[in-house]
């Protein structure tokens, strides 16, 4: 789609017909805030003409629709959509997301550089522009067992790849502050390049030190106060609205025309059911405006501010010389895409059909011995017990304690007190490690659920109140190469196979969406009250998010950054 300078100049001047002209649209100018009736002329993958009338080899009547720049998701894990990059492309690009900046650390935690290279190769074939941040924390800490370890020397050979922006979210903020040698080696290798942050609840001088290490952007702010401190200290704040982490409403008071040059939008982890039912970045735009944010501020955060934050200077405006990423909307408030152009390509079934393919990686990645019911016993002779407390809609958890008397040497789950057993079993074939504990907040009255989506090490996680059902669900995931399963009374009630690394399906996103509906219904039948129980479960194993978590190595006190005895 790259055209000669001569063609760009001639088509921009109207001396030659443009390759594509969007006629009768109204540009929403993100610099001035004006709505202006005009044609948009496109040559190859570039916009060459605005604020004038043009003729084109192909012309599309926009019928008065509002034209805005393509949306940019500034931080996400494609794997959390539970489909391959190709299906993710087909799922979200028609909604106006023309650029996505991904951190493939989910697949990297399973198969290392092979997973990152898979994303880089896939990105060459997509309709959207998928950019990659190199995964900085694989594993996220020393308190878990992943399928791979990536050091600075592993990442440096990929840093100049044209699809790579920089270093992905640096989750091990305690390691940065402690000047851990491995952390400093990665930061030094990417010094002067874009380094994305991840520092939940980090404040004061500790935050200063973290930022001073060269970290520029951050998406973990969950309150306006936290986000404002990060803005004041020069960070670009990425407002997040995922399937579990829902921070938009809390941060929307900051989404003003004054702050919008330093704010972006991201989804982080969003599954295809939520995308189908509610949307993606388009959902965030609608929601923010409904909550009172000015449309100019919101659309800036969705495109122009995002482009500038990540050094993508060729996009973010509908203007000559910019990448031809254009979304035609019914209204600014409705944000429903009637037409999407991505890099000069009209997004339709033909565009997706014309893509190349890449062979998936990390098959047969669930390497764990058969699980017995007795594996879920929790021995102990002391009643005082740490309990992970779920906060619905948050990935931060509470560090609770409860008196749980052992029975025959086993501290057992108690549905009447909303105390379920949680277990994480190492599944990469490394050491066979296993840890068990308690979680409150699922509301589970019977059965079990299991998942190999278990951030970020992606071991096998199980929650239940019946040990036999927990073993049944875990063993079913061994058989189907990973995924999700719901079990009760000795039967599998629902499942979704995720054979690509135990993370992604090979099925169309519509089928994955339908399977998620069945899984949620089955989980509700167990008494589960959480809207998104599987992603909520996944984040209970992430030891870089306060306050209490569990990995295959034990119960983790995140505030003290240590495994409890």
Swiss-Prot record:
PANTHER family: ADENINE DEAMINASE, N-ACETYLGLUCOSAMINE-6-PHOSPHATE DEACETYLASE. Disulfide bonds: none annotated. NCBIfam families: ade. It comes from the Bacteria. It catalyses: adenine + H2O + H(+) = hypoxanthine + NH4(+). GO terms for molecular function: adenine deaminase activity. Keywords: Hydrolase, Manganese. This is Adenine deaminase. Belongs to the metallo-dependent hydrolases superfamily. Adenine deaminase family. GO terms for biological process: adenine catabolic process. Its cofactor is Mn(2+). It holds the Pfam family Amidohydro_1. InterPro entries: Adenine_deam, Adenine_deam_C, Amidohydro-rel, Metal-dep_hydrolase_composite, Metal_Hydrolase. Its EC number is 3.5.4.2.
């Amino acid at each position: 789609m790259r055209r000669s300078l001569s063609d760009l100049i001639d088509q921009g001047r109207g001396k030659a017909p443009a390759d594509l002209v969007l006629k009768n649209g109204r540009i929403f100018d993100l610099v001035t805030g004006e709505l202006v009736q005009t044609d948009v002329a496109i040559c190859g993958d570039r916009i060459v003409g605005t604020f004038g009338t043009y003729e084109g080899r192909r012309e599309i009547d926009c019928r008065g629709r509002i034209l805005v720049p393509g949306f940019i998701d500034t931080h996400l894990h494609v794997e959390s959509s539970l489909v391959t990059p190709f299906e993710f492309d087909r799922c979200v690009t028609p909604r106006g997301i023309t650029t996505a900046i991904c951190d493939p650390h989910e697949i990297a935690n399973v198969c290392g550089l092979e997973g990152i290279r898979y994303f880089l190769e896939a990105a060459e074939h997509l309709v959207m522009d998928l950019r990659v941040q190199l995964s900085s924390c694989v594993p996220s800490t020393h308190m878990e067992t992943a399928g791979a370890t990536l050091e600075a020397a592993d990442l440096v050979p990929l840093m100049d790849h044209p699809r790579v922006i920089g270093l992905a979210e640096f989750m091990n903020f305690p390691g940065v502050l402690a000047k851990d040698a491995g952390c400093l080696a990665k930061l030094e290798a990417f010094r002067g390049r874009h380094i994305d942050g991840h520092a939940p609840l980090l404040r004061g001088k500790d935050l200063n030190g973290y930022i001073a290490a060269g970290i520029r952007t951050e998406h973990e702010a969950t309150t306006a106060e936290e986000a404002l401190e990060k803005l004041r200290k020069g960070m670009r704040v990425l407002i997040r609205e995922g399937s579990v982490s829902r921070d938009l409403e809390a941060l929307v008071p900051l989404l003003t025309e004054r702050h919008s040059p330093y704010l972006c939008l991201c989804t982080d982890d969003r599954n295809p059911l939520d995308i189908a039912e509610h949307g993606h970045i388009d959902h965030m735009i609608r929601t923010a405006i409904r909550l009172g944010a000015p449309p100019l501020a919101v659309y800036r955060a969705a495109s122009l501010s995002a482009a500038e934050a990540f050094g993508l200077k060729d996009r973010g405006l509908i203007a000559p010389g910019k990448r031809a990423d254009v979304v035609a909307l019914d209204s600014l408030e409705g944000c429903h895409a009637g037409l999407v152009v991505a890099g000069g390509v009209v997004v339709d079934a033909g565009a997706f059909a014309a893509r190349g393919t890449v062979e998936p990686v990390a098959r047969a990645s669930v390497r764990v011995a058969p699980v017995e019911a007795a594996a879920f016993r929790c021995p102990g002779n002391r009643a005082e017990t740490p309990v992970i407390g779920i906060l619905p809609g948050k990935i931060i958890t509470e560090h609770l304690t409860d008196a749980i008397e052992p029975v025959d040497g086993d501290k057992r789950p108690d549905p009447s007190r909303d105390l379920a057993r949680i277990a994480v079993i190492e599944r990469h074939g490394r050491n066979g490690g296993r840890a068990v504990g308690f979680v409150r907040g699922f509301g589970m009255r019977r059965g079990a659920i299991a998942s190999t989506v278990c951030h970020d090490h992606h071991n096998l996680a199980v929650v239940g109140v019946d040990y036999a059902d927990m073993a049944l669900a875990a063993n079913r995931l061994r058989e189907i190469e990973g995924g999700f399963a719901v079990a009760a009374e000795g039967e599998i009630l629902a499942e979704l196979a995720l054979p690509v690394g135990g993370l992604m399906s090979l099925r169309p996103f519509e089928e994955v969406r339908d399977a998620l509906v069945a899984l949620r219904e089955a989980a509700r039948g167990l008494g589960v009250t959480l809207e998104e129980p599987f992603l909520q479960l996944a984040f209970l194993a992430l030891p870089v998010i306060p306050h209490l978590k569990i990995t295959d190595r034990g119960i983790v006190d995140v505030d003290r950054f240590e495994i409890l005895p």
